[in-house]
């Protein structure tokens, strides 16, 4: 049964990482637990999954494959809403990525910046999903009323349904997306939008997470209120920002984020100040 659990759900998080890199294992664990939580798995179920992994790592230590176990998220923290990043913090991270590019001339840092800007611009689920977007999966439509160009992405085979469409923030559409397109101007329509020169999407994501974790720790941004903020926290930023700007649009935010209003409350908003502020405004409206 333990092998079945691993192969059915967990292997995709661990099969392409270097087990000797403790931080990579920790990042994979956080991704796994975050997705189990968002799938509405109970504490008991999540504990069973982490027990399987704990036994696996103990066996690996015993056989000299790894030197130590990665850090396992504590259950009391698993159940809390994940702290988001503030916009100015994400800007700091982007600035640092550009500095790393200037220092190393490695364009992977620039494309990591593209990835962060993409997932903060719309209701994407951070992970492999945004990396699978190909050039033919975006289009522009014109809002006849405002004459504004709206950028629409079409995702296939998502976590919850076979096809999902979402729109991007206008700032991203006008200022960031053109930069992404010109980074690889000769790409064909069936080429990946991000990191088109890399075939293995899992390896790309693993490296993105590794860079993100290192830089946010160096900047003193990885932890907030005693909790870690992995790359998935950017999804929380997007949802909370949209809610703060327009609390009446909760159903639209849920639809754009490919989830339900119930999930938005339980996993993104209920434990956050943005919800408390909005409820305060409703309780004590200014006359």
Language-model features: locations:
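Short, basic (Lys/Arg/His-rich) helix/loop patches that form interaction surfaces
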Residues: 101-106, 186-189, 209-255, 261-262
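C-terminal secondary-structure termini that scaffold catalytic or DNA-interacting sites
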Residues: 142, 186-189, 198-199, 282-287
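Conserved tyrosine-mediated DNA breakage-rejoining catalytic core shared by Y-recombinases
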Residues: 131-176
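Short, charged phosphate-coordinating catalytic segments
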Residues: 58-67, 119-149
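Basic, Lys/Arg- and aromatic-enriched nucleic-acid-binding interface segment
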Residues: 43, 47, 66-67, 72-127
